[in-house]
Amino acid sequence: MIQWLSEQNCLFVEQPMPKEKIDEQAWLHERAPLPIIADEFLQRMPDVRRAYGLYDGINIKLMKSTGMREAYRMAILARALDMKVMIGCMTETSCAISAAAQLSPLAHWADLDGNLLISNDLFDGVKIVKGKITLLD
């Protein structure tokens, strides 16, 4: 399947195996034609080092990492290890998405559309305009 995704110009695969399957993930990492990005595997700073060698990059979610400082430190460490960085989210308000967007200069990819999944967002801090994250005044 990953080979097919590569042929379809997919950019990466986000954690295709359960986080407990470490040996299997190591095997896949050595053979995959696409970068594999850790998601459920990591939440905090020590997890970045554990992901090194198993994954090509990490998906940092602000709500899982306990906040801006830890997420920033995770991104800096991942880049120092020559890993790709993705800033992601869960279903969150645009207030949380706006905070996560502040880290996007450190990221190779940003997947910050969780606020689009809620109908009663109390905030108006970020919109997706023509495929780009736009922070409002």
Q: Where do the model's predicted regions map?
A:
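Metal-dependent enolase-superfamily TIM-barrel catalytic cores that perform enediolate-based chemistry
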Residues: 1-32
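Anion (oxyanion) recognition and catalysis
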Residues: 30, 79, 104
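Active-site-adjacent C-terminal substructures of enzyme catalytic domains
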Residues: 50-90
